[in-house]
């Protein structure tokens, strides 16, 4: 009798509004940012084993249940496994319009469709919601022996409800 309630995807936010969902991926981070017409994943959580990661065990089932059939963007803040472990499963499981990261040039994620490095000053608007990349600076990519956390893609998201700072 209650099964139909479980099969209905939640309504999308109105124009200008944002829904942020922080997913429980254990140690690590994964955030779904949803506007009226767009979906972005910020970090993809950890890899648990060679065959299991937060992408195939948590994010893909969640996104399918939420009615998301494609991602407009996928941002990996830095190369630590607790932030990037589920990314390749996401890319295999859903169409992704573009990707961004601060990954080193030899990282496989850099081969993803429409990949671009995160750079301070990048900005875009989706459905009245403003997204602004605040870090890293272009010169940060040239620093030798940089620490991964110091390269984190920092994203500010502003909507009618207020702003959120995602630091990775």
Which residues make up each language-model segment?
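Non-globular, low-confidence helical/coil segments that flank catalytic cores
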Residues: 1-168
